[in-house]
């Protein structure tokens, strides 16, 4: 008996929708790429892509825009995943930004993010001439992402115009682009944070250990717990790292990512904690709080 849509669980419906989108992009575009930020959403998106083309190899590479300030655990996890699954991994860093010493301490989160993330991403997309790029953004994360299409059109400068988006009826997507233009594709658009965690649990998906609670060295700044991940962390006068049981709901560059105090060190405990949470997972991402509407402005400039 065929399993009709109304007999599928909501997670299986989401899975089927995402796999359809991933296969559609692989068939429709000449040179797609999957952006790999190493977080939980990237882990789910990669898992779905591997499912979509199993037992064949992924028909597109993964791209990680490395700022040089990611958690050590993230880089180790990235390299291990590439080795385990054998996918093509492109690691790109803004060479000019690195040589200029751009960092989150001296230059602030806004300028640092623009140069090392946004400009770095645009450099990589131009260098390899990708015409479609998968991203792991979800509509429930943040208000600017809530109004973005699954197929998000970008012009030749990689800019997004929220007032000029293409209609998407049912499961029909318009991927037509001219030379130099591209599409950002978000297969997880309709997933929620809870969906992501439940799917990780049910599918036994590997994720970075930072998502699980452990005793880690942190300093508190403006109510945010920042983990001291290496010797480059600049401590303020009189500031001493404290060992606390913390975990991360979202991952980014370690000087700009806040931890939460938690004892949740298993997936069921994380899911239970998430159900009781009253704040967004991106509350710990300092780049989201640069100014009002900062995420939408970043996306208009070419950010993920």
Curated annotation (Swiss-Prot):
* Pfam families for this protein: PAPS_reduct
What enzyme class is recorded for this protein? Answer: transferase
Give a yes or no for keyword Translocase in this entry. no
Pathway assigned in UniProt = Sulfur metabolism; hydrogen sulfide biosynthesis; sulfite from sulfate: step 1/3
Enzyme Commission number(s) from the entry: 2.7.7.4
PANTHER family given in the database record: SULFATE ADENYLYLTRANSFERASE SUBUNIT 2 (PTHR43196:SF1)
- Which HAMAP family does the entry link to? Sulf_adenylyltr_sub2
Instruction: Sum up the protein's function in the record's words.
Output: With CysN forms the ATP sulfurylase (ATPS) that catalyzes the adenylation of sulfate producing adenosine 5'-phosphosulfate (APS) and diphosphate, the first enzymatic step in sulfur assimilation pathway. APS synthesis involves the formation of a high-energy phosphoric-sulfuric acid anhydride bond driven by GTP hydrolysis by CysN coupled to ATP hydrolysis by CysD.
Name of the molecule in the record: Sulfate adenylyltransferase subunit 2
Source organism of the structure: Acinetobacter baylyi (strain ATCC 33305 / BD413 / ADP1)
């Amino acid at each position: 008996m065929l399993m009709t849509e109304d007999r599928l669980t909501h997670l299986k419906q989401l899975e089927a929708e995402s796999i359809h989108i991933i296969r559609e992009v692989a068939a429709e575009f000449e040179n797609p790429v999957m952006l790999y930020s190493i977080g939980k959403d990237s882990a789910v998106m990669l898992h779905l892509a591997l499912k979509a083309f199993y037992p064949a190899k992924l028909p597109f590479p993964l791209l990680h825009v490395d700022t040089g300030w990611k958690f050590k655990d993230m880089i180790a996890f990235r390299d291990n995943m590439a080795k385990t699954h054998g996918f093509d991994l492109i690691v790109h860093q803004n060479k000019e930004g690195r040589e200029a010493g751009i960092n989150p301490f001296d230059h602030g989160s806004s300028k640092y993010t623009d140069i090392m993330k946004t400009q770095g991403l645009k450099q990589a997309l131009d260098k390899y001439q990708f015409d479609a790029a998968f991203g792991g953004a979800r509509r429930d994360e943040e208000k600017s992402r809530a109004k973005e299409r699954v197929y998000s059109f970008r012009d030749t400068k990689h800019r997004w115009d929220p007032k000029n988006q293409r209609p998407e009826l049912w499961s029909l997507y318009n991927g037509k682009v001219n030379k130099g233009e591209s599409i950002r594709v978000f297969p997880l658009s309709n997933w929620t944070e809870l969906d992501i965690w439940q799917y990780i649990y049910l599918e036994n998906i590997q994720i970075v250990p930072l998502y699980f609670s452990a005793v880690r060295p942190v300093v508190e700044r403006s109510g945010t717990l920042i983990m001291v991940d290496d010797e480059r962390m600049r401590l303020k006068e009189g500031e001493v790292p404290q060992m606390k049981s913390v975990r991360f709901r979202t991952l980014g560059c370690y000087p700009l990512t806040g931890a939460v105090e938690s004892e949740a060190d298993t997936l069921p405990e994380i899911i239970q904690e998430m159900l009781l949470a009253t704040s967004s997972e991106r509350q710990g991402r300092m780049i989201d709080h640069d100014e009002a509407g900062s995420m939408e402005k970043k996306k208009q400039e070419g950010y993920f």
